[in-house]
Amino acid sequence: MRVLTACSVALLTAVTALAQFGGPRGPFHEYPNIPYDGQFTFVRLKYTHGPGGNWYGGWPAWGHGYPLAEQNLMKIMNEVSFMNAHVDEINAISLEDPALFRYPLAYIIEVDWWAMTDREAAALREYIQKGGFVIVDDFKPRRRGRFGGGFGGDEGSDYGNGWSVFEAAMKRVLPESKFIDLDASQPIFHTFFEIDRLDIIPQAYIQGQPIFRGLFEDNDPKKRLQMMVNYNTDVSQFWEWSGTGLRAIDDTNEAYKLGVNYIIYGMTH
């Protein structure tokens, strides 16, 4: 208990300290990847996106928040653990790149804009079956108006239409896959920080509760969690904007706790 309390204090202190840094977001720029060196490197997955998946400033759907969100999360990881993760160097890797299999954990966002190719489906299947852990974030049901769909998206397209697009794509990856709604009793919410309630997780959008779903090996909740899904929220937005003062520190703390737990779980399972 004392260790967890100390870590919570360290997390709050670290989040407060991040306020001195500038925030996002100018034109999109993709940075060179670093070679694998055995040190933990956060990996973001690149993918083929459908119509409407290119946003303001040339940001592709897969790239929102890159690399600042994960850089801030890695600063927190190094504050509360001895992981010694790379902080400034964030790798953005295509599913078709064999280098992906050197990394046990990968992060992907805005998956309802994903126009999954056959090669991407096959690569993701192999990655998961070989033990890779995938964190999915930042997508929601389609809504009308300013916050609905993508900026300049095609209203006649299924892309940007929330869960149904992603679920259909995952049936191409693992045809028997069944996502299970998770509650706070799941081990992933207790691997480092004790997250006893999910109804306090901040909402990055404009309505509804965040929904947490998991994909388990053989669809058995007693087996390995292969994919963790944050639906109807954008946890990484709190990491990304934590240096701006635009998000409450308490909410940002909860988002960082999730990120830390996800990484610890992925690295130990």
Task: Kindly give the residue locations of the regions a language model identified.
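An acidic, glycine-rich "communication" segment
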Residues: 23-26, 50-56, 142-241, 251-256, ...
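Aromatic-Pro/Gly-enriched surface loop or interdomain linker
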Residues: 19-105, 109-112, 234-235, 241-269
